[in-house]
Amino acid sequence: ADVPGNYPLDKDGNTYTCLELGENKDCQKVCKLHGVQYGYCYAFFCWCKELDDKDVSV
C-alpha cells in the first residue's frame, strides 16, 4: 500500500532538493516546517510522510 504523503514546496513553489537519500536531517527539518513529523530524501527531493495537500506550501 502506498503511504500517503507529498513533496513539500518552498515559498517560491519549488521542491526541496536533497543529496543524501533516505533518512535526511534537512528533509526532517523541512517536513517539521510543514507540520509533519517525518520525511526523507526520495529521488533527490524531500518527501514528507502524511503531508496533506493544504500543507504542501508554507
Swiss-Prot record:
Asked whether the UniProt record includes Amino-acid biosynthesis among its keywords, one would answer no
User: What positions does the domain LCN-type CS-alpha/beta occupy?
Assistant: 3-58
For this protein, the record's InterPro entries field holds: LCN-type_CS_alpha_beta_dom (IPR044062), Scorpion_toxin-like_sf (IPR036574), Scorpion_toxinL/defensin (IPR002061)
Q: Which domain of life is it from?
A: Eukaryota
Q: In which tissues is it expressed?
A: Expressed by the venom gland.
Q: Does the keyword Chaperone apply?
A: no
Subcellular location(s) per record:
Secreted
Read off the domain note. Answer: Has the structural arrangement of an alpha-helix connected to antiparallel beta-sheets by disulfide bonds (CS-alpha/beta).
Could you identify this protein by its name?
Altitoxin
Species this protein is from: Parabuthus transvaalicus
**Lineage, please?**
Eukaryota, Metazoa, Ecdysozoa, Arthropoda, Chelicerata
